[in-house]
Amino acid sequence: MTLQELRYLVALADHSHFGRAAQACHISQPTLSTQIRKLEEQLGVTLFERTNKSVHVTAAGREIVARARRILADTDAILDAGQRQSAPLAGHFRLGVIPTLGPYMLPWLVPALRREYPLLRLTVQEEVTSRLLESLTSHRLDAALVALPVSQAGLDSMALFDEPFWLAMPRGDKMAKGKAVTEEELHGQHLLLLTEGHCLRDQALAICGSLDAENAAEGDFRATSLETIRQMVATGMGRTLLPAMALGQPKDSAIVLRPLAGGLGRRIGLVWRHSYPGAGEIGLLAKLIASHLPRGVHRV
């Protein structure tokens, strides 16, 4: 049994499809199938239940896949520890980011990381918070950029910056005039929201403080991205809350933006496993982010 075979095993468990797993491993599908069958013969158990369209990890396979993840994570940690002795933030680093942050933060963060730490091999995973936390605890990620607070055993967090929300509405909307929007004005307002699972949706509903806002949004429109919602606002479908980094440049002339009174918004931070050996790397990443923050957000 080799480390490469364990990587094939984990890839197939993650993708639940021989073709996609083979592509991720940069090998042919027959080669992957042969390696998995060889591993099953060595272990004397069936690791995957195969169908015409997908594969599923068996009960026996789940424990073996979990152990394989830990072995691979420890192996990567050994390799990275050696590289860190000669250079900071070197080796493989797996970063997660929520979808309402990634499109607006990664375009400046990734180039900055490459300039400052050329030996870093960065892998980015964009997912909702619950899945990022699951990937952290299962050693598939090293750290994640999420909205705080996060309360989960075994995870540490560090606040980075506060990002205010803005009310976005079509030009001509009755709320389009004025300066900062108060909580009283927002209470019970109909907003266009993201689908369930996005933390920004929950934050918007908390600010509006009304089940009516949720019911109205569910009945009219649900989106999986802020950019889709922005376009719907521009066409006059309704209002939404946008984080500062998502306001867009140049500004859309069909959309009017008003800040929220009191700086209402979200706090963004890094989350990582308490047992993660590269705590110093987390600090370096946080420092780099703080030094490159765009206008409109406020360092904590």
Predicted regions and their residues:
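A late-sequence structural motif
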Residues: 105, 256-299
